[in-house]
Curated annotation (Swiss-Prot):
Mg(2+) 2 binds at D346, D350. This is S-(+)-linalool synthase, chloroplastic. It catalyses: (2E)-geranyl diphosphate + H2O = (S)-linalool + diphosphate. InterPro entries: Isoprenoid_synthase_dom_sf, Terpene_cyclase-like_1_C, Terpene_synth_N, Terpene_synth_N_sf, Terpene_synthase-like, Terpene_synthase_metal-bd, Terpenoid_cyclase/PrenylTrfase. Residues 27-40 have a biased composition (Low complexity).
Amino acid sequence: MVCHVFSSFSSSLIRVLEAPLLLPAASASSSSSSSPASRSGGRRRRAAHVRPSPAIYPGRQELASHSSMLPTDFDIKVLIERHEALTDDVQEMLQHQRRRHQKTASGGRERIATVDHLRRLCMDHYFQDEVDDAMDACLLEELAHGGDLLDATLAFRLMREAGHHVSADEVLGRFTDDNGEFRLDYRKDIRGLLSLQDISHMNIGQEASLCKAKEFSTRNLESAINYLEPNLARYVRQSLDHPYHVSLNQYKARHHLSYLQTLPIRCTAMEELALADFQLNKLLHQMEMQEIKRWWMDLGLAQEIPVARDQVQKWFVWMMTAIQGASLSRCRIELTKIVSFVYIVDDIFDLVGTREELSCFTQAIRMWDLAAADSLPSCMRSCFRALHTVTNDIADMVEREHGVNPINHLKKAWAMLFDGFMTETKWLSAGQVPDSEEYLRNGVVTSGVPLVFVHLLFMLGHDVSQNAAEFVDHIPPVISCPAKILRLWDDLGSAKDEAQEGLDGSYKELYLKENPGLAAGEAEEHVRRLIAGEWEELNRECFSASPSRSSPATTFPAGFTQAALNAARMVGVMYGYDGERRLPVLDDYVRMLLF
């Protein structure tokens, strides 16, 4: 296992350093750009949202200067060797705990606690055999129904994450009074309250005990911060601001490590391995970012479509956070290119094309024929050539690695995205106001989430040839949930992020039109309830060991559902604007995970 870990890291780093860039057959030309102001019939809906904040999305000079800071091959070799040695140390510790567990009952609790630390540090996959052995179902069941709040809630979380059926009401009922309220003697159990707060976000719907758990733990942790010692107070504050289940684990891991380093009893090997792991992952992501940056600069679309968003770092952050693991480096790079085209095509529809041009653009995509785009403006032809090349390259890569060529399914996914954008264009040009539910259904498609995840599904080697058409036509909940969460969050932040001319709609705006007696705050609260409902549905999909009830014939690999969950976790970060129209949490994520 250890050798596999390091060969995965080293081979991924070498591939990023040496792999040739997958460039389009012809780069876009900046000399033939088309100004949206000169295009008759064009409707500018997002004219103020054409350039990102430099504080969050550094420009080319900043990114170029950063590339000179990358370590040498010798530095990489030293990092990998240290990671290998520390992994051996932690593995030896886990084996020692296993032997102790065989002798004493308390050893089981120690092993479960270690598994929790490894998961919070995003390192459990290096020790999968040991983790599986420690996750004894009988022990977890015993702890979940015991009388210790920390043990019970931790066991509940681990069991639910593993797909086991476990009742929140049964587990938490032991800690409530006759009225179903949590007993007051748990108000001072800080670690128990933190664990209770963790599981309160794992609601799969109609779990009243978890709603009460969230209210009870939040209220008492907030009041406890004032008297806790500083290190624990910071950890509690961070846990409340960024709840474990709905936050990116990579980000939480850094804060968990900082907390572990303040404890009187420490596991030095595990802490040092976490630091080495952070360094290697950051290095790998920096190299991936450099390759994507080179591809984007050589492509030339930023010069040809100057009003379009030029946010290479933002596009990469989506994939960096959703798809984890050194072995999936190439997957992150190629899917970042797909994400970039979603943004560029959105801007072409919003800012550049007339309805007639966009209709022809959509038809060319349906035909998947470059010649069909000959009559289009230069920027559209260049965009089509680029996305056509990248998509075909991905299909060829999937065929080489997995023996299936998914190009027909990928073409259909692209056509679905363009049809969704075309629907919005028709609404706008005709002055038509869709109802909120119709808007949201189309918004799932135009979010780009289904398109990206269709590509991901095939790149992971999952053969859905029997039902891929159904996957595209009837988007499964594991994809529609993060897509709806993204669309609704985006709409909540659109007033801060965009200055729109005309009504291309937001769910909140349309809902207010349908309910004229509501105040804006009530409509926003309705949207937040919808987001919470989508999280509950996504939890059901991710925590169920059986196929989805909505699509019983379809099961997805664990890496796929984890990516969907991570995408949902990142939405609030990507659209969490503060009062000054900044994204401070995203800035913190990027600084911590990439630079």
